[in-house]
Regions:
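CN hydrolase (nitrilase-like) catalytic-core segments centered on the catalytic cysteine
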Residues: 1, 148-166, 251-357, 386
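Structural motif
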Residues: 136-137, 163, 241-243, 266
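Active-site-proximal beta-strand elements of phosphoester/diester hydrolases
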Residues: 90-111, 201-203, 241-250, 268-270
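Cys-nucleophile CN-hydrolase/nitrilase-fold catalytic domain and related Cys-dependent amidase chemistry
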Residues: 115-202, 273-275, 284, 288
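Extended repeat-based interaction scaffolds and adjacent low-complexity, acidic/S/T/P-biased segments
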Residues: 1-83, 91, 329
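N-terminal active-site segment of His-dependent metallophosphoesterases
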Residues: 77-134
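A short C-terminal boundary segment appended to hydrolase-like catalytic domains
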Residues: 337-394
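Active-site catalytic loop in hydrolytic enzyme cores
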Residues: 58-86, 176-262, 282
Length: 394
């Protein structure tokens, strides 16, 4: 039985907790235990070596303040756990240019999600196209996929060996709370011919004022767990890369944006956002402040979906798109290895400044801008070596 097949029933039970406080970050912990009992517990009777299996799905073991590090590790042979099976850290990123219809997520608020064949065909067309373009990470906008199709995304992620990040339409629990959830699906290979997928769902930390009003107007409530002190973000360590996902209005928090400084190679933001100019200013600053690639995916009618890199302004937008009646997948390769190299050289240059070469020679060798003040060299080396960024003792 696949891990993601067990995840869904555990998730549904967790949406209606007895104490009224949602703890989505504990869903993987419960699923791991159940997965182990059903698939590998019997091996103990035959003294078979399977002690490493539980570690494979130990996805929520390190936390520091508001950051939860999630390591989707893989192992290939001889029962050995491998953190760096994939030596190439560069990634092919795909952003989906699609229109998110307000009628769809409003229907979900009324517990009447639109699960039509037309929507299903369109989503599968997007997934097939991203596979043809050999995407390694596919990003969809906020509120773009019905909550009921989580298992479909997990299945496609596992089969196509492609990470998927998507905002899910609202799901209403028994407490009449409207949950805005962003989902991340991480495919893994834990044996030569055995693959699986680890879904990670996170509740939106900061609902936008207009979003709160819409929920109240539909006679619903925002989750009790929403508060600035309780906010938590995932730091994913997957296939020799580090990234995090922010859900639209979360980017408006300066403190929350700063949590990932030096800790990510790229940052993903899913959006359903009308205020394009404001968010354009935010991500334009973010790409330089965090010195990482930024993948922004908004609904097509508002646009400004793009892939950015920390270079001079004229080159920073690698992909940028708005509009269109039909869905489209736009891909670009982000050179994480080159970025890390530049970060390391930039930090050393700050520490030990030396006379520069001629300007023309410098321009040939430098692609990215220098790192901002206070950029941690230890974090750079940790990412290059594939270690955990957050110490368990923190």
């Amino acid at each position: 039985m696949y891990y993601y097949e067990l995840y869904m029933p555990v998730l549904l039970c967790s949406l209606n907790p007895d104490d009224g406080v949602l703890k989505l970050n504990e869903v993987n912990k419960k699923t791991r235990s159940l997965y182990w009992q059903l698939n590998f517990e019997w091996m103990k009777m035959f003294d078979l070596s399977a002690g490493v299996i539980p570690k494979l799905f130990e996805t929520a073991k390190r936390s520091s303040g508001k950051v939860l590090e999630i390591g989707a590790y893989e192992f290939i042979k001889n029962g050995l756990l491998k953190k760096n099976v994939y030596k190439d850290c560069d990634k092919t990123i795909g952003i989906v240019n699609m229109k998110v219809e307000s009628t769809n997520y409003v229907s979900s608020l009324k517990s009447k999600p639109v699960l039509s064949k037309t929507r299903s065909v369109a989503l599968n067309r997007i997934l097939d196209e991203s596979d043809r373009q050999k995407c390694e990470v596919l990003v969809l906008p906020e509120l773009s996929v019905p909550f009921q199709w989580i298992e479909l995304l997990a299945t496609q992620s596992q089969r196509k060996k492609m990470a998927i990040v998507s905002g899910l339409e609202y799901v209403v629990n028994q407490a009449d709370e409207a949950l805005n959830i962003v989902a991340t699906f991480l495919p893994i290979q834990w044996a030569k011919y055995k693959t699986d997928c680890i879904p990670v769902l996170r509740l939106k930390n900061h609902y936008a004022p207009g979003e709160k009003q819409m929920i109240i107007d539909n006679a619903l409530k925002c989750p009790k767990s929403l508060s600035h002190t309780d906010s938590c973000y995932d730091l994913f360590h997957w296939r020799n890369s580090y990234f995090s996902v922010y859900n639209c209005f979360e980017l408006a928090s300066i403190e929350d944006r700063a949590l990932m400084k030096g800790k990510v190679d790229f940052l993903i933001t899913t959006e359903f956002n009308r205020d394009v100019l404001y968010y354009s200013d935010i991500v334009g600053s973010l790409v330089r402040d965090l010195h990482c690639f930024v993948i922004q995916c908004n609904t097509s009618q508002f646009g400004d979906s793009r892939i950015m890199q920390p270079t001079e302004s004229i080159l920073k937008n690698m992909v940028r798109v708005k509009g269109g009646k039909s869905e489209a997948v736009l891909t670009e390769i982000i050179e994480i290895s080159s970025l890390r190299k530049q970060q390391r050289e930039s930090v050393k240059k700050y520490a030990n400044p030396k006379p520069q070469k001629k300007a023309k020679e410098v321009e040939k060798t430098i692609k990215f801008k220098d790192t901002p003040p206070g950029f941690n060299e230890y974090d750079i080396m940790t990412r290059e070596n594939g270690y955990d960024l957050i110490d368990p003792a923190d």
